[in-house]
Every structure is written in structure tokens, then in C-alpha cells.
Amino acid sequence: MKRVVISLGGSIISMEKLNLEFMEEFSRMLGNIKGYDGFGIVVGGGKLARTYISDLRKYNVNDNILDEIGINATRINALAMTTFLDDVNSKIPTTVNDAAEMMHDYRYVVMGGTEPGHTTDTVAMLFAERINADVMINGTSVDGVYTEDPRKNRNAKKIDRMNYDDAIKLSIENSIGAGSNVFMDITSLSIAKRSGIKIFVINGLKIDEYINILYNGTCNGTIIE
């Protein structure tokens, strides 16, 4: 079975408003892809999650509840994505195992977060591991992995290829300090390493990137393997 998992960052799904144009274009692109048995799609929370969390934090709402709110925001975005796809689940799974079971019934299975402490990148990697996918595509708001956050340092350099250990090391370095911005969390990268899942980190808004990866195994972002 040839399957791929795609992680769509919340920043490209839910910006100032829900990015319906992207959802439609992305779904149309997947519908035209041949040679694959199924796609797992994991969706982030984006502006919807950030708005709820930042507003409620002012009222000292505890972190566990904020985590649950963030998770439910990802599931709302996931449900919105399903409306643009055919042969897709209508109920959003709450666990990776449930999502994997749905792959037997649908070509596309869309989900959000699962539990506090797990980012949607980690969920996507666990999903990929569970369904024996060789590839996870991480659609982000930047066009790959950089030595530093390119939005803060114009001298940051993009990395075309890196191994798992170097990616984990960079993730740790990026997670230190105020206002840190991590391209992928350590847990997701560690799962990829143990299962040999190749990661493509790309600008998720560029539809051609998905096509190049799925047909040619190439991208203009960063490949981690």
C-alpha cells in the first residue's frame, strides 16, 4: 500500500480567516494525483486556536483546558477540510488508531490533534508510522528548514538536506529562548528517525511542491532522512 501523510500547519489553514481558497486548491490537487492508495491529512489550529487560547489565558484558565481548546480548534479545521474532498471521513477521529482504521474505508482521512502535549506534527508522524507510510510532508509557513528563524534573521540560511540527528539537534537549539520558533518538535523527529520516515518540509501554500514530491520525490524545501 502506497500511502502518504501530510501535516498542514495551522498558519496556512487558518490565518486572519479560514483559507478556503487553499483548501479547495489543495483538495483538487490531491484528487488528480494517481498512483497512491491513500492520504492521511493532519490539520493544525492556526488563528482559531491562538485567538481562543490568548483570550482565555488573560483569565487565568489552566493550561490543560487551553490544550483541549487548541485540540478542538484543530478538529474544527479538519472538519472544514473534509468538505472539499470526496471519499473522505465525515467524523473526525480523536486517536491515531481510529484514523488508521478509517484508512481501510476512505482514500482520505483528515484529523486534527489528539491529546495534550502532542503537536499536530507528532500526530502526523505517529499516523505515518501506524499506516506504514514512507513519507510525511510538512506544509509550513516558510519554505523549508533554516539555520535560524528567517522571519527574525535575514541572514538565516535554508538547509536543503539534513539527517535526523542534525534535525533533532537544530530543533533543540531552536526551542531554547524566548519567542522560539521550532520547525518541528523533537518528538516528531524522533519518531521519523526510528521508523525511517522521510520528511519534506515545504511552503505549504505552494501546490506545485506537493506535486513534485508525490511524483518526483523532489522539493524546493528541506528533505530530512
From Swiss-Prot:
Its main location: cytoplasm. It holds the Pfam family AA_kinase. Inhibited by UTP. One of its GO terms (molecular function) is ATP binding. GO terms for cellular component: cytoplasm. GO terms for biological process: 'de novo' CTP biosynthetic process; UDP biosynthetic process. It catalyses: UMP + ATP = UDP + ADP. It is found in: Cytoplasm. Disulfide bonds: none annotated. ATP binds at residues 10-11, 46, 50, 140, 146, 149. It comes from the Archaea. CDD domains: AAK_UMPK-PyrH-Pf. UMP binds at residues 45, 67, 114-120. Its EC number is 2.7.4.22. Pathway: Pyrimidine metabolism; CTP biosynthesis via de novo pathway; UDP from UMP (UMPK route): step 1/1. The keyword Cytoplasm applies. Keywords: ATP-binding, Cytoplasm, Kinase, Nucleotide-binding, Pyrimidine biosynthesis, Transferase. Belongs to the UMP kinase family. Homohexamer. Catalyzes the reversible phosphorylation of UMP to UDP. HAMAP family: PyrH_A. This is Uridylate kinase. It comes from Picrophilus torridus (strain ATCC 700027 / DSM 9790 / JCM 10055 / NBRC 100828 / KAW 2/3).
